[in-house]
Amino acid sequence: MELIIVLGSRINGNDMHDELKGRLDVAIKLFNGNSRMLLSGGITNHDLNRSEAQFMKDYCIANGIPEASIILEEKSLDTIGNGVFCAMIVHGKYLPEVIYVVSSCYHMERSEFIFEKCFGPGYRFDFSHCFSFNRPDINEKESIELARRFFSGLLDGDIDSIKERLFNMHNLYIGQ
C-alpha cells in the first residue's frame, strides 16, 4: 500500500484557495488502486466549523477518489501538528511501502524535517511531489528554525515525547 499525505492550509472563505487545490491535484495524480490518501488539517478557521481535511475530502471525491480510500486527520493546526497526528494515525495501523508527503514546494524542506522527526526510522518517504506556488509573504527559514528548536533533544520517532512537548509547549496546542 502507498500512502499519500496531503497537508492542509488555512481556508479563509467558503471554498478552498488555489494553493490547496493545487496540492490536492498533485496528490490525485499520484493516486492509484494501491493508494490510501491521508488528508491532514484541523479547524483553523473557526468561522467555518469544518476542518481543512473535510474540505479536502469533498474535493477528492468530486475528482474521482473513492471515499473508502480517504483517511482524515482533523486535529492539526500547523505543520508540526500535521506530522504528529499523521504519525499517530499511521503507527501500528498501516504499513505503507512508501509515504508520499504532498504540500507546496516552498514548504517541503520544513515538511520533510518534521515528518522524519515524527515518524522516525523504518518509513520510506517521498517528498518530491509538490505544488509550485509562490508565497513571498512566508518566511520559511524562520519556520524551519522554530521547528528545529521544537524537536531539539527529542529522538526521531519518539511520538509519545513529541506529543507531550506539543501539548505542553506549543502555543496552538497547550491545554488540549
Region locations from a protein language model:
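Charged phosphate-binding loop/patch that engages nucleotide di/tri-phosphates or the phosphate backbone
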Residues: 152-176
